[in-house]
Amino acid sequence: RQRQMCIRDRYQQYLKLEKSLSPNTLDAYLTDLDKLMSFLTLEGIDVLEVCLSDLQRFAAGLHDIGIHPRSQARILSGIKSFFRFLIMADYLEADPSELLEGPKIGLKLPEVLTVEEIDNIISSVDRSKAEGQRNRAILETLYSCGLRVSELVSLKLSDLYFDEGFIKVEGKGSKQRLVPISPRAINEIKLYFLDRNRIEVKKDYEDFVFVSQRRGKSLSRIMIFHMIKELAQNAGITKNISPHTFRHSFATHLLEGGANLRAIPVSYTHLRA
């Protein structure tokens, strides 16, 4: 058990330092690994003595308890990454996961919103509510900049360069990039700042752009997810959408407008008048 924890700690350091994973991705890798570690402990199997049949029984268990095939595939992909690390770190000479197969899953294309649907969602925001203007600013920023939700919630006041028409974003692996922001999004954020100035923002959160009206702290990804789900429902949209839908729609609309796919992360085309 102690050796397993030592190996887990080394793997965590490897993911953090060598792979430069974001905290959320790192947590997901370790949570999935812990599922395997718990299984091995219950079975009385040392992690360095695992064979393919052990991993196949673990994979079968994921199916038996009703874990979605896509989640199964993600977990097993993380397990394979762990055993590649064990080979690289000289814990093992052979990889028992090399022939491990995941569930067969079809390619599921993400939902895309039309420009009209995006406008309808933004229009469904109730400006009379305390968080109304903030939510409009969030939606405009998500769409016009094509941000990940993790990038949105961590956006700082010191990252805004409105005069130049850019914002600075810290993406996956702590990589920073400059992203163009639309005049419409800038205007919505400036209107939101009139409300934000009246919020008692807690210490250590003063530099976050989007904060909770009640708590005075930065928003969580889950809060953004629920907000978008509710607004889409209010707008009569039946598609299964999430914050990432805005990012995917942004990229799709750029392509439809003639943008180069490789240029999408750093470019912005005015899609709405």
PLM feature segments, named:
Residues 1-4, 8-273:
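Conserved catalytic core of the tyrosine transesterase superfamily
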